[in-house]
Regions:
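Catalytic Zn2+-binding segment of zinc metalloproteases
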Residues: 157-176
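Active-site His/Glu-centered metal-binding helix of metallohydrolases
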Residues: 153, 157-161, 230, 234
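Hydrophobic or amphipathic, alpha-helical segments that drive membrane association/targeting
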Residues: 1-121, 178-222, 252-256, 304
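Active-site-proximal gating segments in proteases and membrane effectors
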Residues: 106-131, 195-197, 205-206, 235-304
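An active-site-proximal "capping" alpha-helix that borders the catalytic cofactor pocket
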Residues: 68, 96-101, 224-241
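Membrane-proximal, non-transmembrane interface segments of integral membrane proteins
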Residues: 119, 135, 151-152, 162
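Alpha-helical transmembrane cores and adjacent cytosolic helix/loop segments
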Residues: 142-143
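Residue-level signature of catalytic and energy-coupling elements of molecular machines
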Residues: 68, 97, 122, 136, ...
Length: 304
C-alpha cells in the first residue's frame, strides 16, 4: 500500500521557487498601474501615484500578512505541530508536511493545524513560503485514507512553494488600482460637467465600477484555475500521480454522493473552495477551481 513510508524513499528534485515570477508579477502590476494612470487619467494624477499604490496593493498585502492570525481565529484552528497531534491521522499530517518541507528545501516548517468542520477541506495561507500555515478539516481526516491525505497535503504544499498566495494578492491589487483610476476619471468628469449631467455621471460611475468588479472576478477566477492545475501537477511530481489522483477521485465520490460521509454531512468544498463542480456554461467563468473531471484527466495524462 502506498503511503508515507514509500514517500520517504522517493527522490524528489525540489523545484526552485520562482522568485523571478513573483518579482515579474509585482513589477508588471506597478508598471501597468502607472501606464493606466498616464493613458486614462493624464499627467495630473501621476502625483497621486504613490498613494494609489499604497491603497490598491497595500490592503491585499496587509491582509495576506495577517492571514494566519485571522484564519486561526475564524476557524478555531488547533495547532498540532510541536507535539500537539492527538490521533494517528493528525500525526500523519504533521509527518507528511514535515517530510515535504524537507524535500522542497523550505527553510522553515509551515505551521500545521486542524479545525472543526465537516467539510472535506484543506488550505494553505501565509505571506511567504517560510511563513506559511497548512490546515486541514476534521472532516477530511475522517473521510480520507493515508494516500489521499498525502495527496491533498502535497497540493497545499505546492501552493506554498509556488508563492501562489502572494501572486494572487498582487493580482487583486492591480484590479483594485484599475478600479480607483476609472473612479477618478468618472468623478473628475462629473465635476467638470455639473450642468445637467450629475445623475448620469453617477449612474455611469456605478455601472463602470460594477463592470470592473465583474471582469476582475473573471480574471481572478481564471488565474485561480490555472494555479490549481499547477499545484496538482507539482503535487504529482513530488509524490506520485496516483496520490493526487486518489485524492481527487475521493473528492469526486463525495461530491456525487457515492460514499457515506462519516460525519453525516454532505456539505462539500475541495481544498477550501465551495462546491462549484456542478457549474456549467457561463457560471464556469467564476469558478475558482477547474472541474474535478478536468483535474483528474490532467493527472492521468501524467501517468502515461
Amino acid at each position: 500500500m502506498k503511503g508515507l513510508a514509500e514517500l520517504k524513499n522517493k527522490v524528489v528534485n525540489a523545484p526552485h521557487v520562482n522568485m523571478f515570477k513573483v518579482a515579474t508579477w509585482t513589477t508588471m502590476g506597478v508598471f501597468a498601474t502607472y501606464l493606466l494612470i498616464y493613458i486614462f487619467a493624464g499627467e495630473e494624477m501621476l502625483k497621486y501615484y504613490p498613494l494609489l499604490i499604497v491603497f490598491a496593493f497595500g490592503a491585499p498585502l496587509v491582509s495576506l500578512m495577517t492571514s494566519k492570525a485571522s484564519v486561526k481565529r475564524a476557524y478555531n484552528i488547533r495547532m498540532i505541530d510541536n507535539g500537539g497531534a492527538r490521533t494517528e491521522k493528525e500525526q500523519l499530517v504533521v509527518d507528511t508536511v514535515t517530510l515535504l518541507s524537507e524535500k522542497l528545501n523550505l527553510q522553515k516548517l509551515p505551521e500545521i493545524g486542524v479545525y472543526p468542520s465537516n467539510d472535506i477541506n484543506a488550505f494553505a495561507t501565509g505571506a511567504s513560503k517560510n511563513s506559511a500555515m497548512v490546515a486541514v478539516s476534521q472532516g477530511l481526516l475522517n473521510n480520507m485514507n493515508e494516500t489521499e491525505i498525502i495527496g491533498v497535503l502535497a497540493h497545499e504544499m505546492s501552493h506554498v512553494v509556488n508563492g501562489d498566495m502572494l501572486t494572487s494578492s498582487i493580482l487583486e491589487g492591480f484590479v483594485s488600482a484599475f478600479g480607483l483610476i476609472i473612479s477618478y476619471i468618472i468623478l473628475n468628469n462629473r465635476r467638470n460637467n455639473r450642468s445637467g449631467g450629475a445623475a448620469a455621471s453617477m449612474a455611469s460611475f456605478y455601472m463602470i465600477k460594477n463592470s470592473i468588479n465583474f471582469f476582475g472576478r473573471i480574471i481572478a477566477s481564471a488565474y485561480s484555475r490555472r494555479r490549481e492545475f499547477g499545484a496538482d501537477r507539482l503535487a504529482a511530481q513530488i509524490t506520485d500521480p496516483s496520490y493526487m489522483k486518489s485524492a481527487l477521485l475521493r473528492l469526486q465520490e463525495i461530491s456525487e454522493g457515492r460514499v457515506d460521509l462519516q460525519d453525516g454531512d454532505r456539505e462539500f468544498a475541495a481544498f477550501k473552495i465551495t462546491n462549484n463542480f456542478s457549474m456549467g456554461g457561463f457560471a464556469n467563468l467564476f469558478s475558482t477551481h477547474p472541474s474535478l473531471e478536468k483535474r483528474i484527466a490532467a493527472i492521468e495524462r501524467m501517468e502515461k
